[in-house]
Amino acid sequence: MARKDSEDQKKFMSRMFRGKEIFKPLNTGWIDEHVACVREWVANIFFYTKNGKTIMVDAGYNYERLGEKMGWLDIDPSSIRHILITHQDTDHVGALEQDSELLFRDATIYLSEEENRYLTGEIRRKVIYGLYKLPMVKIDNRRVLLTDGQIIDIDGIKIECILVPGHTWGHMVYLIDDQYLFTGDTIWFGADGGYSFISTLAESNKLSVKSLAVLEENLKRRNESIKIITGHTGWTDNLEFAFRHRAELCAPFKKRMHDPNAPYDGYEESEDTEQSARGARLAKQIDYAAK
């Protein structure tokens, strides 16, 4: 999807979701000493740093302020050599597209074998219950294709690759160093817990719900404290909260529990500043149902 398409999507989505409390991105900053994020309108991209090495999780929109905001975190785009891709939607791979600023032209990207079929043109991405095909994404970066359950090591960082299809056919989540789960667009956090991600954007809602059940059981067996980090609605370390409504869909226009921290318009970025990025840590999602 070209930069113009990204801008058009921004205008359309801003009008459609204004006041609906659907998108609640983190502002640019640090979750803890290992994980940082950049806010791009309603989306977050993430950086994981360990022993002086940094990898990136997703590549956001085709967004002209990415380099600037990475500077707020003291991360040089040229230092990024490895990017984990949860899925190929334009708000997760835009900075890799052919007409982007190509900040990461030399980086290797990692994605599932199934998800790569979108990039080769074997299948097309469909939304709105299969009624609308999205423009094909074009990326030239070197690719490493992953399989479900595969464990890889990048610069001493352990990455477990877990297939969670539904939003897209090859959506993958990444468990890093057994402590941080980057979930992309599989889980949507509401004020009262996690739901299966936005219904109108899924390839198969039925498969999404089934996949989340499998993921929850996978995590429960580990008996470990894990930070669950989403692409659009923040993070939590409460497993029960994250999966509380996993069998239900986030229906964009359905009335739900009010979240006083949700922005009226997620595409308005005036509160995302360098001062805040260099300030306090980014707080986890509040469970308003427990109040």
Language model: regions and residue ranges:
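Active-site HxH/HxHxD metal-binding segment of metal-dependent hydrolases
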Residues: Y63-R65, G71-Q150, A247-R256, P260-Y267
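Metallo-beta-lactamase
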Residues: K11-G19, F23-L26, W30-D32, Y61, E113-P165, W169-F241, H245, ...
